[in-house]
């Protein structure tokens, strides 16, 4: 009767109940007064809106002071969250966590222990406590137990309740019974329907959307890199982040069904390459951080091998080239080797074949001219050659990315880079004044063309890729001494590939580079040939014999065979082809031939000839063609291939 009387007084006071409840519902969920144990009247008066204050002022002796009306208004206001979602209050943000909430797990095995309970929720986040108690619903059965797991967030407890409810055998096949799941508000001891949140996630009829549907979860799991985690509406809650205020209803609706990548389709492959494993529970903020800072998986930091080489002393260069592992590791870890199998990344320099010589920078960049100018010669032009098919079809490329020339720089050094996977070797050589054609003829300052040592196997031959770069040097302490020489040495070691059947040495002594640097150039312009496995022996005395030469070269490592013949000429004795004895020596590999050239250049034959000692001994140079190969095209085809034809005879 008092309730009806109070409603009559309320109608007489000309205050609409809907207006009072609507305004009060806007303030009640935003306050935390309901979370503290306090009297109902005090709690309600603290959070009541101005509409009820007006009621008190209009009728101080009426229903406002009655506890029944106060409790009625309080109950009606706090219970609006259980509406059908169509009233005015359903649009208000009233789903504020006033927990904690308890997840109850019943129908358990008889021998369950607390340790097993912790194992079940070991991967769950936001767990406050886990208890194993006797079930109060079965007071006469002491064996019935219940697992009570306390969560601080409604989104977390409903999320894990749905997961457990979807499992038919939580405890394995030995206990093939479905466990019963309940969610209870610890303060009010009222059950919470966690399945309601699942259905509302698909109908979008109520703002209580803490959980996406199961089909949406499967789609998100299949697209782990497109996962969206936003506040309480996440399918994989994140503990403290779930207690933050939810976004607005419009943004929530737009995000709830947005399963595509919000950061762009082009970043999917980057995230898959940079992050090997990404959990579904990653937040949107963390995912954006991952996409903006990609790191190549499994790739070590690359080092600048060319710069580290030029920063060394001269003695250290020899050690690094022949015996050092650092340069080998640098080349092995370089992105150039990876670019042969996959598209180049942004850090890989792009070849510009028609660019100027100073604009092309190789993969192994060199230091500036200010670094150790007195110890090492500053770089000016350098390039790296690759096995590109269109280069082979253009034999007259000028100013290409292969070798750049500059008449103002007198001396060059060509180094073939060591490959870590194939354990290749290289020898430093000094040449001068490089023209820009593919004949690679290097001329000295006095106008005599000299021998060249290009990286021919990677330019002209459709074989395996070899790496090299051209380094120019100008050492002020040795310029005068170098100008006195008629020309400079011609030698270069070519890499031995794993996929070839050529037997080659894997280690070269440290003194080989120093020996090669002291080798004078061939005096005859016809001796300027690219490196191959066959050496031409020049400046032989007229009475030289095959036995002497065989005795001299047979002790060299990698020696294969020797071809000797006498070809006398009426022009007298000279220092080149067609005069006196002719000898060609074939080795198993270019590296063996290069080593023999460095060690035996200028040597005397076993039988001394005093009249010829002042001529400097024998002069070695690379043969135009490998032994047994003839033809004008062999220079561009077979002369650069150390796995194609030098085994023939």
UniProtKB/Swiss-Prot annotation:
InterPro entries: Nucleotide-bd_a/b_plait_sf, RBD_domain_sf, RRM_dom. Residues 228-238, 631-649 have a biased composition (Polar residues). The modification Phosphoserine is found at residues 22, 206, 258, 283. The gene is WHI4. This is Protein WHI4. Residues 533-625 form the RRM domain. PANTHER family: U1 SMALL NUCLEAR RIBONUCLEOPROTEIN A/U2 SMALL NUCLEAR RIBONUCLEOPROTEIN B. Its main location: cytoplasm. Phosphorylated by PKA in vitro. GO terms for molecular function: mRNA binding. Pfam families: RRM_1. It is found in: Cytoplasm. The lineage of its organism: Eukaryota, Fungi, Dikarya, Ascomycota, Saccharomycotina. GO terms for cellular component: cytoplasm. SUPFAM superfamilies: RNA-binding domain, RBD. Has a partially redundant function to WHI3, a dosage-dependent modulator of cell size. Residues 196-217, 228-247, 438-461, 604-649 are annotated as: Disordered. Keywords: Cytoplasm, Phosphoprotein, RNA-binding. It comes from Saccharomyces cerevisiae (strain ATCC 204508 / S288c). One of its GO terms (biological process) is mRNA destabilization. SMART domains: RRM. Induction: Cell cycle-regulated. Expression peaks during S/G2 phase.
């Amino acid at each position: 009767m008092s309730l009806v009387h109070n409603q009559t007084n309320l109608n007489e006071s000309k205050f609409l109940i809907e207006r009072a409840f609507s305004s009060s519902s806007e303030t009640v969920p935003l306050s935390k007064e309901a979370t503290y144990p306090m009297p109902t009247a005090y709690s309600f008066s603290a959070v009541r809106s101005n509409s009820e204050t007006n009621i008190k002022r209009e009728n101080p002796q009426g229903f406002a002071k009655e506890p029944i009306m106060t409790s009625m208004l309080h109950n009606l206001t706090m219970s609006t969250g259980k509406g059908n979602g169509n009233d005015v209050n359903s649009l208000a943000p009233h789903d504020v966590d006033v927990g904690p909430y308890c997840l109850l797990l019943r129908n358990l095995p008889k021998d369950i222990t607390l340790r097993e309970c912790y194992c079940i929720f070991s991967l769950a986040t936001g767990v406050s406590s886990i208890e194993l108690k006797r079930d109060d619903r079965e007071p006469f059965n002491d064996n019935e137990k219940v697992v009570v797991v306390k969560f601080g967030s409604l989104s977390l407890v409903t999320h894990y309740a749905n997961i457990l409810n979807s499992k038919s055998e939580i405890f394995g096949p030995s206990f093939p019974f479905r466990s019963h799941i309940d969610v209870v508000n610890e303060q009010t001891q009222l059950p919470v329907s966690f399945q309601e949140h699942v259905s509302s996630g698909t109908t979008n009829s109520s703002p209580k959307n803490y959980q996406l549907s199961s089909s949406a979860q499967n789609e998100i799991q299949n697209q782990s890199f497109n996962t969206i985690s936003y506040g309480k509406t996440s399918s994989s809650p994140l503990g403290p982040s779930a207690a933050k205020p939810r976004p607005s209803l419009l943004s929530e609706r737009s995000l709830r069904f947005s399963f595509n990548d919000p950061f762009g389709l082009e970043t999917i492959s980057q995230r898959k390459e940079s992050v090997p494993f990404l959990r579904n529970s990653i937040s949107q903020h963390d995912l954006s951080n991952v996409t903006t800072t990609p790191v190549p998986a499994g790739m070590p930091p690359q080092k600048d091998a060319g710069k580290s080489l030029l920063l060394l002393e001269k003695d250290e260069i020899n050690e690094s080239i022949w015996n050092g592992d650092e340069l080998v590791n640098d080349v092995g870890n370089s992105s150039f080797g990876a670019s042969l199998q996959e598209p180049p990344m942004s850090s890989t320099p792009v070849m510009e074949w028609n660019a100027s010589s100073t604009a092309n920078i190789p993969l192994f960049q060199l230091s500036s001219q200010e670094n150790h100018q007195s110890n090492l010669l500053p770089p000016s032009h350098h390039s790296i050659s690759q096995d590109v098919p269109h280069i082979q079809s253009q034999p007259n490329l000028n100013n290409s990315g292969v070798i750049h020339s500059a008449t103002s720089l007198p001396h060059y050094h060509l180094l073939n880079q060591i490959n870590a996977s194939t354990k290749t070797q290289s020898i430093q050589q000094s040449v001068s004044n490089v023209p820009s054609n593919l004949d690679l003829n290097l001329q000295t300052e006095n106008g005599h063309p000299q021998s060249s040592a290009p990286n021919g196997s990677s330019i002209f031959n459709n074989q395996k890729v070899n790496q090299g770069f051209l380094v120019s040097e100008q050492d002020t302490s040795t310029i005068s001494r170098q100008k006195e020489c008629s020309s400079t040495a011609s030698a270069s070691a070519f890499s031995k590939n794993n996929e070839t059947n050529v037997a080659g040495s894997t280690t070269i002594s440290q003194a080989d580079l120093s020996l090669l640097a002291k080798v004078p150039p061939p005096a005859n312009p016809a001796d300027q040939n690219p490196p191959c496995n066959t050496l031409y022996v020049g400046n032989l005395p007229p009475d030289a014999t095959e036995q002497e030469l065989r005795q001299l070269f047979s002790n060299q490592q990698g020696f294969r065979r020797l071809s000797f013949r006498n070809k006398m000429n009426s022009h007298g004795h000279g220092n080149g082809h067609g005069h006196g004895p002719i000898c060609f020596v074939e080795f198993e590999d270019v590296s063996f031939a290069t080593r023999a050239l460095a060690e035996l250049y200028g040597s005397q034959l076993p039988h001394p000839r005093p009249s010829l000692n002042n001529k400097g001994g024998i002069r070695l140079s690379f043969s135009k063609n490998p032994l047994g190969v003839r033809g004008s095209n062999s220079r561009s085809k077979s002369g650069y291939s150390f796995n194609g034809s030098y085994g023939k005879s």
